Design a protein with these regions (language model features):
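Extreme N-terminal tail/first-helix region
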Residues: 1-17
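Residue-level signature for short turns and capping positions that connect secondary-structure elements
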Residues: 23, 50, 70, 119, ...
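Short acidic (Asp/Glu) patches
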Residues: 47-51, 64-69, 92-103
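Helix-adjacent hinge/juxtasegments
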Residues: 53-84
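Alpha-helix boundary recognition
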Residues: 10-11, 58-59, 98
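Charged, gly/pro-rich active-site loop segments
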Residues: 74-138
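Short beta-strand segments
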Residues: 14-49, 57, 63-68
Length: 138
């Protein structure tokens, strides 16, 4: 079970940075609005199939995600680093995304979901450099 503090951090934010890699090993990143499915522990976002990151996810589903609180106050630094597997989203994922972003209901959406295999939360509000780690293998 994912620590509540990790879940709460993910739920409080709405933009992630998605990292993918090309077939020849070249990294790429893209910012995406996301919704979090707590029940399935998945991050849901949209991406047109023509985008570079979507094309790369089709070739290699292993991705990384970063979500960060922007602050200059060291004692408030928080962020997650996530490794996971991307897949095409389903109708239920679409409903979760539209609930978070109602204006998206009128747009054609290519839904994606990432199932985390590893999450690390750095949270200086718990103590300088304090990290909480979740691993799907444990």
């Amino acid at each position: 079970m994912v620590d509540k503090r990790i879940v709460d951090f993910i739920k409080r934010h709405h933009v992630l940075t998605l990292a993918t890699v090309s077939g020849n090993g070249e990294p790429y990143c893209a910012a995406c609005f996301y919704a979090y499915d707590k029940e399935q522990n998945r991050l849901i976002f949209t991406s047109d199939d023509s985008t570079r990151h979507a094309q790369e996810m089709l070739q290699n589903a292993n991705v990384a995600i970063g979500i960060t609180l922007e602050t200059r106050i060291v004692g408030k630094v928080q962020g997650v680093q996530i490794c996971g597997v991307a897949e095409r989203g389903c109708d239920e994922d679409r409903k979760i995304y539209i609930k978070r972003f109602p204006y998206a209901a009128v747009a054609p959406l290519n839904i994606w979901a990432v199932k985390p295999t590893f999450i690390k939360l750095t949270d200086n509000t718990l103590g300088f450099g304090k990290k909480l780690i979740w691993n799907s293998q444990e």
